[in-house]
Amino acid sequence: MREYNLFTSESVSEGHPDKMADQISDAILDAILRQDLHARVACETLVKTGAVILAGEITTTANIDVERIVRDTVNGIGYHHSDLGFDGETCAVINMLGKQSPEIAQGVDRADPEEQGAGDQGLMFGYASNETEVLMPAPIEYAHRLMERQSELRRAGELPWLRPDAKAQITLKYDGSKPVAIDAVVLSTQHDPSISQADLQEAIMESIIKQVLPAELLHAGTRYHINPTGKFVIGGPVGDAGLTGRKIIVDTYGGMARHGGGAFSGKDPSKVDRSAAYAVRYVAKNIVAAGIADRCEVQVSYAIGVAEPTSISINTFGTNKISNDEIIRLIRTHFDLRPYGITRMLNLLQPMYQQTASFGHFGRQGSETAFTWEKIDKAEILKADAGL
């Protein structure tokens, strides 16, 4: 008898308050990296009605206008008028950023860059699956694409009543590890008070859901919940406080893979919470692209001030074509997972982080220097070395 199971993932829009905070933190990081590639940045953001509060530790020679960066970022997201409940030009900006502890610096910095220590202890996971073209789990991939479509239509003015805050959730039916049907779609979007619920639901269905989700996965039994609570006029930081790093599952694999707990945004590449998570996505994606496994989860861990990972482990969920020990050998041979090696391998000292802070960090393309961890340039080398 065939076994079916359901799996659900969610995404949120760029106007969600937590994602606002992520984008502000990464906008500040990008501005600093444009002037100082050796900066140490850990920037946290809190947004709530009428205010943006910054805190964290930064060591840099860069001279940036923090307040202007915050205002431009908020305006760029779409909160640029008091009618929306939040205005980037008039909100308070409270700057509580300080300097990084010299005790941390002495553990990280080295005369030989190759021996740069990890910025903290921790564990990170990377994942890839061949169920979608971008080698991402299908539920989170489709949820992200719904949110991207909402943003595109809002920015283009095609649905002028859309506002920045929105959420999407996809429940997929699996036959084993293969997605075979979409069981439920939830999409809630902030909107102007002028639009009726009937018109909103029709527009969301026709212009977003049907334009994004594969028709072959939709069926007569698919359930749709479009703004199921009714009105959603009050949103963004007026409706809820937003914090950097509070959407770590949205940022990664939608719960399909494990998570080490560390957030990404506002952190320079010396923080392995971010850089190593990108690196093990790169590893897992190339393993799957090489046909070595259909699904692959890679874990790596670090000790503060130590360059070499304290562990590398994998789970291929029984889909591996060679032994797991041999896959570990391939990883150690072809990927430098020391902090400096990761930065060099993925060219991470680039001001490209703000674009990662909405619609997921994985399974995407952006500017020429962004999302380098999505390349599959090692797949053929791995395949050859594996003897496949």
Swiss-Prot record:
Principal location listed in the UniProt entry: cytoplasm
Residue numbers binding K(+): 44
Annotated Gene3D superfamilies: 3.30.300.10
Residues where Mg(2+) binds: 18
Start and end residues of each stretch annotated as Flexible loop: 100-110
Binding site for L-methionine: 57, 100, 240, 271
Pathway it works in: Amino-acid biosynthesis; S-adenosyl-L-methionine biosynthesis; S-adenosyl-L-methionine from L-methionine: step 1/1
Compartmental location: Cytoplasm
One MF annotation (Gene Ontology) recorded for this entry: ATP binding
Sites where the protein binds ATP: 16, 165-167, 231-232, 240, 246-247, 263, 267
GO cellular component term of the entry, any: cytoplasm
UniProt GO BP: one-carbon metabolic process; S-adenosylmethionine biosynthetic process
Subunit (UniProt): Homotetramer; dimer of dimers.
Function: Catalyzes the formation of S-adenosylmethionine (AdoMet) from methionine and ATP. The overall synthetic reaction is composed of two sequential steps, AdoMet formation and the subsequent tripolyphosphate hydrolysis which occurs prior to release of AdoMet from the enzyme.
Protein family according to the UniProt entry: Belongs to the AdoMet synthase family.
Name used for this protein in its record: S-adenosylmethionine synthase
Organism from which the protein derives: Psychrobacter arcticus (strain DSM 17307 / VKM B-2377 / 273-4)
Organism placement in taxonomy: Bacteria, Pseudomonadati, Pseudomonadota, Gammaproteobacteria, Moraxellales
